[in-house]
Amino acid sequence: MKTLYSLRRYFHVETLFNSTLVVGGRDQESTGFAWWAGNARLINLSGKLLGAHVAHAGLIVFWAGAMNLFEVAHFVPEKPMYEQGLILLPHLAALGYGVGPGGEVLDTFPYFVSGVLHLISSAVLGFGGVYHSLIGPETLEESYPFFGYLWKDKNKMTTILGIHLVLLGIGAWLLVWKAMYFGGVYDTWAPGGGDVRVISYPTYDPSVIFGYLLKSPFGGDGWIISVDNMEDVIGGHIWIGTTLIIGGFFHIFTKPFAWARRAFVWSGEAYLSYSLASVSLMAFIAAVFVWFNNTVYPSEFFGPTGPEASQAQAFTFLVRDQRLGANIASAQGPTGLGKYLMRSPTGEIIFGGETMRFWDMRAPWVEPLRGPNGLDLSKLKNDIQPWQERRSAEYMTHAPLGSLNSVGGVATEINSTNFVNPRSWLATSHYVLGFFFFVGHLWHAGRARAAAAGFEKGIDRDTEPVLSMRPLD
């Protein structure tokens, strides 16, 4: 009678049309997974799984190196980075490599070196991946017990977690050392329009650093995305780096507490689901960060934020019309509100027109023109610098309006080329990928919990009444 219904009731993988198909010596019968399930076939083969992960890392680093060199080869120094579809060079520039005052690219050689180093690293990782996939031991527990593990070994799992946390902490400290001792980083707030600057006095005050975490994520509060100076950015990395390292050693030298042993599912698929959730959360934060923040993501490299481009337009026409004789303080727009300047709900002098909605936007090119009560009328009449005019005019025509697939954009280029601001690419892609990773988390978390409960292969139907009923035909 059991042959009357599909074996899929009992097995959570599809049955192959050709059950003799064997890929890499891992058939469905011996692993419970078909060839397209990929690394799932290697769940209990730590040596082969190591090979898969090292090879995967090699592919990632190869892409980084190859794309890096591709961007270097196509880079035009006379044009802003955000006009050239670049997504890697802006990050290197923000770290202070190859740039000078105003974000001008002075030397592309550091970018070339970065690409070559990534390619060399990818070759080493690729060799290691092939070796461990084809030649190395299938399992590591016997030959290399330090690198071996069992998914249900809770102490070993938290030790591995601790090692990862220490490595992440070292990564955070690498940025700190670069900013403080190895040439500095690019600071968009440096006087005169931004420059590479050594961060000599990072913020150590925990009330400031953790104050960001306690802020509301809504409206003008902005949670950690509201950080607006490099001292706080580097100070935050000191705190998070130190916390990660301390937490890492804690997990290395301790065993999980009883409540943790009870609360978590301890299996390979459960750890995968936890990781996917973490990456998803980071992707969502990154999407909002790159969309709104112009300190960590300087507009000189990533293009203006939406509010910044809007305010830049108001500023550009204020400058133009003031030169033509307009009285910027008293001129009225079609609605009776100030055409160039008006007051915010709390009394500050702000730009007028539609950009009033972005009245609390902060950007390096406009902050020098503010006084104790918003924009300073005297400074607007007498102290506007040429670099501020040039930058606002550039930002006005490069708003982040395009979509992920380049539809839309701003038709400000000749030859019908629509511009897509890198912030559009980075924010949209991270949001979409963050969503996919979250769905992956739900999928694998559900499977892991079902497996822990003992019914991942379907509920036992031996006692169902339908089994004793007459067949339909």
Curated annotation (Swiss-Prot):
Signal peptide: none annotated. The modification Phosphothreonine is found at residue 15. Keywords: Acetylation, Chlorophyll, Chloroplast, Chromophore, Manganese, Membrane, Metal-binding, Phosphoprotein, Photosynthesis, Photosystem II, Plastid, Thylakoid, Transmembrane, Transmembrane helix. Pfam families: PSII. GO terms for cellular component: chloroplast thylakoid membrane; photosystem II. [CaMn4O5] cluster binds at residue 367. It is a multi-pass membrane protein. The modification N-acetylthreonine is found at residue 15. InterPro entries: PS_antenna-like (IPR000932), PS_II_antenna-like_sf (IPR036001), PSII_PsbC (IPR005869), PSII_PsbC_sf (IPR044900). Belongs to the PsbB/PsbC family. PsbC subfamily. One of the components of the core complex of photosystem II (PSII). It binds chlorophyll and helps catalyze the primary light-induced photochemical processes of PSII. PSII is a light-driven water:plastoquinone oxidoreductase, using light energy to abstract electrons from H(2)O, generating O(2) and a proton gradient subsequently used for ATP formation. NCBIfam families: psbC (TIGR01153). PSII is composed of 1 copy each of membrane proteins PsbA, PsbB, PsbC, PsbD, PsbE, PsbF, PsbH, PsbI, PsbJ, PsbK, PsbL, PsbM, PsbT, PsbX, PsbY, PsbZ, Psb30/Ycf12, at least 3 peripheral proteins of the oxygen-evolving complex and a large number of cofactors. It forms dimeric complexes. This is Photosystem II CP43 reaction center protein.
